[in-house]
Amino acid sequence: MIVDANLLLYAVDTESPFHARARDWLNSQLNGNQSVGLPWQSLGAFLRIVTRQGISEQPSTPAEAWKTIEDWLECDVAWVPTPTERHAEILGELVQRYQLRGNLIPDAQLAALAIEHGVEVCSADTDFARFTEIRWHNPLAED
């Protein structure tokens, strides 16, 4: 699996109504047996948002946010999926096929990574449903 930034953010944002479910899900995954992909794109978005003034009443310091990332990456099942030589071709196909613009481009980048590595995307973002080429799962959705 590849984890989108929104799940990482909800897992640490105690103000979010999704906090407990996201935290429990992420902890379960990071302590489980299945590989958990934490792309730099997701980690970078997490770092950008949790340290930003105005998003939260008490944003994380850069050191606190980086420590969280280090803790995740130290888990035995964590890995950082990187683009392969096919990334540009796959990303270009997705952008053109779905006529993507703006905020949908990062979703296409994660979808391309998922295709390259043959894994599912875990995200609370329903925009991933548009990509028929990938498996997408929202672990926060009501069963």
Predicted regions and their residues:
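Anion (oxyanion) recognition and catalysis
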Residues: 30, 73, 115
